[in-house]
């Protein structure tokens, strides 16, 4: 990048935020109605990060509440398979700030782009992708959180096959003792990934099984390269679901809350289920058996994330020590969901959440400090024009133009208010293409430095999502050998996954 443009970039993005000198802006990687996302270098750690500037946060209380919800959930749900907020910049004024700068770990693409750009993903990819999603979902559900909008675009991806769940703006926390909750909402899940019990219903009593259905749809999309249930409307959605799964039994239809949808299914001609071996030819029978469980029409027949992880499909990969649970989120954290809040209320709540990333000021706040304005003296001069420069130059085809993915999670585009097939149960895992698996696990990278640039924090100019996960450029050993997290709170690094799986494969040949 031209040095003069670099200086302009670094003096226009952050406006008044004095902490901005910590980050060296690299390029724009996303832009939408919410604001701008830029990649940057954290000069304290040398890491590449994504910084999302959210404009006019408090223009609509509903949008501000969604942002508050996601910032809070991502702080409380820290897990290797969930995108991480690394920092939130302290605003220049407690009472008057309008924009928020959230610093995320930088991810290269999302699962939607990976599926679209790769027609040669292997069974090992499918297995490891699904394993990560279920492992993250187990953690989310043990916190009594329902994600409610799982889809490929809401799953970030790196070229080492690491996936991370993101976009928690529509998530909800259940505080009922019963394993279900009732929510009034204007939007739940993109239709294609929406569980049948939610079709046409905005007032829904449901369970974590809604997320399990979404995971099943995502898994099927991995296997075929295209969405499984691309419904054009609610009726069409029900039609294509039943075309594959067959007409549901009366007790399953009774669980549909929308009266019209319930009546439509009750009057539908009887359809036999399509064998999954016909719909998904050449797919591992164990994978199809698990998929059939995930896509059970009746939510009570779907497994929990923990039960799915125990499926024989993950034999040799799943390990309870690497699949941590967590405690339910305390009710006090989401007390604001139970009352009507004003713009001033949500501003104070977001400010309080930002202070979680500024421990010294948090202590002062908790002691009752009343400081309401703390302008940074050099902030305006250094960053005043940066945002305008980013908007002006975004999407002009210059070097380093962004990928389609908005690489950080928070927040989504603003959403307007709406106007068992029997698998091969005794199939032995030891017979599952062992020679192919060993070859893949032992295959060396195509070059000595393959895949190292991103992990070392250096730039990858010209990187394309189309190259992501190509078999010619990445081996399953690298896929399964995820980058270890420093000081892992879960007791062992992800390299142990490789060791365990490699030992298992070796044992199969003895």
From Swiss-Prot:
Q: Does the keyword rRNA-binding apply?
A: no
After translation, how is this protein modified? Dually phosphorylated on Thr-185 and Tyr-187, which activates the enzyme.
Q: Could you name the domain of life of the organism this protein comes from? A: Eukaryota
- Please write the reaction equations for the catalytic activity of this protein: L-seryl-[protein] + ATP = O-phospho-L-seryl-[protein] + ADP + H(+); L-threonyl-[protein] + ATP = O-phospho-L-threonyl-[protein] + ADP + H(+)
Q: What is its EC number?
A: 2.7.11.24
Which residues fall in a compositionally biased region of kind Polar residues?
Answer: 433-461
Provide the positions where the record notes the PTM Phosphothreonine.
Answer: 185, 190
Q: GO CC: one term?
A: nucleus
Write down what this protein is called. Answer: Mitogen-activated protein kinase 9
The opening ranks of the lineage are: Eukaryota, Viridiplantae, Streptophyta, Embryophyta, Tracheophyta
């Amino acid at each position: 990048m031209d040095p003069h443009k670099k200086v302009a970039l670094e003096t226009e993005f952050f406006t008044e935020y004095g902490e901005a000198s910590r980050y060296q802006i690299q390029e724009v990687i996303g832009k939408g109605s919410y604001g701008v996302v830029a990649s940057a270098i954290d000069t304290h750690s040398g890491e590449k990060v994504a910084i999302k500037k959210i404009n006019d946060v408090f223009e609509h209380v509903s949008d501000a509440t969604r942002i508050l919800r996601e910032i809070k959930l991502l702080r409380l749900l820290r897990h290797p398979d969930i995108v991480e907020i690394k920092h939130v910049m302290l605003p220049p004024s407690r009472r008057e700030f309008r924009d928020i700068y959230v610093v995320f770990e930088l991810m290269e693409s999302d699962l939607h782009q990976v599926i679209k750009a790769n027609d040669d993903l292997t069974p090992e990819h499918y297995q490891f992708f699904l394993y990560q999603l279920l492992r993250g979902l187990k953690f989310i559900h043990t916190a009594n959180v329902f994600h409610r909008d799982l889809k490929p675009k809401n799953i970030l991806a790196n070229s080492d096959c690491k996936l991370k769940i993101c976009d928690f703006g529509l998530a909800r926390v259940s505080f009922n003792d019963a394993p279900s909750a009732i929510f009034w909402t204007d939007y739940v899940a993109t239709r294609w990934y929406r569980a049948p019990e939610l079709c046409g219903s905005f007032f829904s009593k449901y369970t974590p099984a809604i997320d399990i259905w979404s995971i099943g749809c995502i898994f099927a999309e991995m296997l075929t390269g295209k969405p499984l249930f691309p419904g054009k409307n609610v009726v069409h959605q029900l039609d294509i679901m039943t075309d594959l799964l067959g007409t549901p039994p009366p007790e399953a239809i009774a669980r549909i809350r929308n009266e019209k949808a319930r009546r439509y299914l009750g009057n539908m001609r009887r359809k036999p289920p399509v064998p999954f071996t016909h719909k998904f030819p050449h797919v591992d029978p164990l994978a199809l058996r698990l998929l059939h469980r995930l896509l059970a029409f009746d939510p009570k027949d779907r497994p929990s994330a923990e039960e799915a992880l125990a499926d024989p499909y993950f034999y040799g990969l799943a390990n309870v020590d690497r699949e941590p649970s967590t405690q339910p989120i305390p009710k006090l954290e989401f007390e604001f969901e139970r009352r009507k809040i004003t713009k001033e209320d949500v501003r104070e709540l977001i400010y309080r959440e930002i202070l979680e990333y500024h421990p010294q000021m948090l202590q002062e706040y908790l002691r009752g400090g009343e400081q309401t304005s703390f302008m940074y003296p050099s902030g305006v001069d250094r960053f005043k024009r940066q945002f305008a420069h980013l908007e002006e130059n975004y999407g002009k085809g210059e070097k380093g133009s962004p990928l389609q993915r908005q690489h950080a999670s928070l927040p989504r585009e603003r959403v307007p208010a709406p106007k068992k097939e029997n698998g091969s149960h005794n199939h032995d895992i030891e017979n599952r293409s062992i020679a192919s698996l060993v070859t893949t696990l032992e295959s060396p990278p195509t070059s000595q430095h393959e895949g190292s640039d991103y992990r070392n924090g250096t730039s990858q100019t010209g990187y394309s999502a189309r190259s992501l996960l190509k078999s010619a450029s990445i081996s399953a050993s690298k896929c399964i050998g995820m980058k270890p997290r420093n000081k892992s709170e879960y007791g062992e690094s992800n390299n142990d996954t490789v060791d365990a799986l490699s030992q298992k494969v070796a044992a199969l040949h003895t």
